[in-house]
Design a protein with these regions (language model features):
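Bacterial Sec-dependent signal peptides at the C-terminal "C-region" and cleavage site
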Residues: 2-21
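Second-shell loop/turn segments in exported
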Residues: 16-20, 34-47, 71-74, 107-118, ...
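A non-catalytic alpha/beta surface segment that caps or lines the substrate-entry region
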Residues: 28-90
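Sec/Tat-exported extracytoplasmic proteins
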Residues: 30, 34-41, 57-64, 87, ...
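Structural recognition of the beta-strand scaffold that forms the well-ordered cores
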Residues: 32, 66, 84, 94-98, ...
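Active-site-adjacent substrate-binding region
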Residues: 45, 68-70, 182, 189-289
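Acidic/histidine-rich catalytic neighborhood of metal-dependent amide-processing enzymes
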Residues: 108-209, 226-229, 234
Length: 333
């Protein structure tokens, strides 16, 4: 091989684009997770789920960290485990992209949570493969959260978001919260009839970047213009002063029913969210990096306090929106 050909080959390797999000791979992960069956926190099935997630991430060349603890729920003590992988970037300041992998505990019917618990985990496994090959401006931590679902039938008080609250508290204690710049949450993104609304309890600039990205990609039929208020795993981060956004489709007839199966989901929906998240990531990295450069210090944002005004209520018709508590945010988004 001539020197010229070697140079051309080296240039091609250097500029090769990172792999794209592959919904076929994500769908296969979702299929495998759903095949495990119901996966509530503390169950043998969720242990099997953790094993599958860990095997897939390890095969992608990533090191999985377990964060385990015993949680006192209104029913009993439950072992819970968050899983995370860290993908280094040009800066150690990091973005967390998270989703829960547990399913709600039901004894009266078989609940496999294809979209609610399955889609977020499957999405993150595939996203890990893509981000590992990407040149990241910031360090990215992918976080698989346990214990998002309430143990009692209804979402209330502190019987929910166990994993995200534990993660934030541990990050506060060990000092790692100081390098956490923003958080993106994916939840219930498998809906065959995907309709993601802006969450009014999410940070406005993150919402704007995501919805602008969807519009540029001609995906605004899926990321639609109206909004609702959601209580989810992003709120413990917001309460700690971290900009956070919830990407969630609550307009889902199969939510918390035996019909939340693969038949109610679509690989296309996973692809849409993958394309938007990856398309938005450069802008998010640029905004965070610019802020760090301008301030000349490692700050994680203005502290916001979050107040629950009234409990979540469920509305069952097709165009219902599951409103988990309305919140007021004392600082501007």
């Amino acid at each position: 091989m001539t020197a010229a050909l070697v140079s051309v080959f080296a240039l091609q390797v250097a500029v090769a684009p990172p792999p794209k999000f592959d919904s076929g791979r994500a769908w296969e992960h979702l299929r495998q997770l759903v095949a495990i069956g119901p996966r509530p926190s503390g169950s043998p099935a969720i242990e099997q789920t953790r094993k599958y997630i860990t095997e897939q991430l390890t095969a992608a060349g990533l090191s999985v960290v377990e964060q385990a603890w015993e949680e006192q729920t209104p029913i009993e003590k439950v072992k819970m485990v968050n899983l995370s992988v860290t993908i280094p970037g040009a800066r150690r300041d990091r973005i967390v992209i998270a989703g829960h992998y547990d399913t709600k505990l039901y004894r009266q019917f078989r609940f496999v949570g294809a979209s609610d618990g399955g889609s977020s985990a499957a999405f993150l496994i595939e996203l890990a493969r893509v981000l590992k090959a990407r040149r990241n401006a910031l360090t990215i931590e992918l976080l698989f959260l346990d214990g998002e679902e309430a143990r009692l039938p209804e979402w209330s008080g502190t019987d929910n978001t166990y994993g995200s609250r534990h993660y934030v508290e541990m990050a506060r204690r060990d000092g790692s919260l100081a390098t956490l710049r923003t958080m993106m949450l994916v939840d219930m993104i498998g809906d065959r009839d995907l309709a993601i609304r802006r969450d009014a309890n999410s940070t406005t600039w993150l919402n704007n970047i995501l919805w602008d990205t969807a519009r540029r990609q001609d995906l605004d039929d899926y990321f639609i213009a109206d909004s609702t208020r959601i209580e989810d795993d992003h709120l413990p981060f917001r309460a700690a002063g971290i900009p956070a956004v919830d990407i969630i489709d609550l307009d889902y007839d199969a939510w918390h029913t035996s019909n939340d199966t693969l038949d109610a989901c679509s690989a296309r929906s996973l692809q849409v969210v993958g394309d938007v998240v990856l398309g938005a990531l450069p802008q998010i990295e640029a905004k965070v990096t610019k802020s760090l450069v301008l301030t000349g210090r490692r700050v994680h944002g203005t502290k916001r306090s979050v107040h629950v005004l009234h409990a979540k209520r469920k509305v069952r018709p097709r165009d219902r929106v599951r409103e988990r508590a309305h919140l007021s945010l004392e600082a501007a988004h």
